[in-house]
Amino acid sequence: EITEPPLVELINSPSLQRLKGVHNGGPCQYIHQGLEQMTRFNHCVGVMLLLRHFGAGLKEQLAGLMHDVSHTAFSHLADYVFGGDVYKLDYQDNILGEFILKSEIPEILARHGLAVEEVQDPHGFSLLEQKIPDLCADRLEYSLAHPMMARHLAPLSAQNILAHVVVEDNKFVMNSATVAWKYARAFLSWYTLELAGPRCVAAHQILADAIKRALTIGALVKEDMFGADEQVLRKLRAANDPHITQLISTLTPEFDCVIDGLHPDLKSGVKFRYIDPLVRTKNGLIRVSQLYPDFGRELLEQKDKFHLQQF
């Protein structure tokens, strides 16, 4: 049970509550069924709970709650709409500090004797955030909580994975090479086939094109993107623009696409995400890719494939 006043107040704040209407996968929610619970709110709370489980202090838990508060509607779609780098997907990171300062969050923290500067940078907390390919609460939560990950992990479960995650020197490592290898392989398969598969990448570009068109004709303004997914979608439908209508009508579970480098209808890309956990062995901390060279080669092959996609 969460009883600490600053955590409770932050969870109930307008900035956090808005995230209940922001889907982690953006337009992927329309082409994959059963992902309704994958919201930025649930992710942020899940990250906070993971940090709590592994003994992180109050400030790191608060930072975990806040780390995605600057996401726009449809999450990473902002990088496609506003000219961000789709191979980094860091639009929300770049505006996080400014977004927090303009929100009610500093006032909430001040009421509990905390300065916003103490908790607003997620990269100042080593359990919360680490660079790829290391484990962190953010990466653990968004992979292990995702319904599609389950079939890639099977017969292992998220609980099996977390049972072998330990904290050393305030960083996450794993104490079973076999479990770490299975998790890393499942993550790679899940991400490349599902989250960053052709259908999801194409769906991001299609919805981004619709939103850019709406911004151009005045059916949307930039501030609308800091609402919820359905609010933006309603405005797209209300635009009564044939091009917008045609684009958003394609985003259904029946949507499919074909990779075509010769005569593409659209071009897009996406960030390459993977994990290569450090494993505690009798010879010290060693990465999965070193313990399992075949996995290391598979990682390199997938990295080479992850470039501009044309459909």
Set out the residue ranges of the language-model regions.
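Histidine-centered, transition-metal-coordinating active-site segments
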Residues: 1-59, 73, 77-311
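Short alpha-helical catalytic segment bearing the HExxH-like zincin motif
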Residues: 60-68
